Amino acid sequence: MSGMEDKKLGRYERQTMLPEIRTGGQERLRAARVLVVGTGGLGSPVSLYLAGAGIGHIGLVDDDAVSTTNLHRQVLYAEAEVGLPKVVLAARRLRALNSDVDVKPFACRLTPDNAAGMIQDYDIV
């Protein structure tokens, strides 16, 4: 087994059974770097699934705080977190879901001024 230990690989057993993934594919997922822009309605579930699938490096960009109006559709957040920064909470939740994932929060908006510097470290946005 090249790279991933049996214990860690066991977590992904269901997806590594797929001929398209196998162990080599899971190792590629572990090496992947994904930047999620926005941790709201779409970014919230997307980031959960990326962490659950074993994407090794996830960047999160968001400058917003949780509001009551978010709670019915943004599954990363809870009532007690209203007013807190989404990106900080999202990073914490993803790390709790999968401690093998490196999560980097960016508490800002993606703008023309910062996009190049932020995106350069990721394989996909």
Regions found by a protein language model. Give the residues of each.
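Adenine nucleotide-associated cytosolic modules
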Residues: 1-125
